[in-house]
Curated annotation (Swiss-Prot):
Gene3D superfamilies named in the record: 3.30.60.30
The protein, known as: Ovomucoid
Site (Reactive bond 3) location in chain: 18-19
Family matches, as PANTHER family: OVOMUCOID-LIKE-RELATED, SERINE PEPTIDASE INHIBITOR, KAZAL TYPE 2, TANDEM DUPLICATE 1-RELATED
């Protein structure tokens, strides 16, 4: 099974769009889009990872 990853190098960003393209984090929480997910990754100091694309 290939690991899924997201490039969060451009983050954090002060504001995210309302775009809905859900991602599921390793915390079993669904994030509405890459921006929201990447901001959470930065806040977690890299402990949060992507579980899979789509809702949890």
């Amino acid at each position: 099974l290939a690991a899924v990853s997201v490039d969060c190098s451009e983050y954090p960003k002060p504001a995210c769009t309302m775009e809905y393209r859900p991602l599921c984090g390793s915390d079993n929480k669904s994030y509405d889009n890459k921006c929201n997910f990447c901001n959470a990754v930065v806040e977690s100091n890299g402990t949060l990872t992507l579980s899979h694309f789509g809702k949890c």
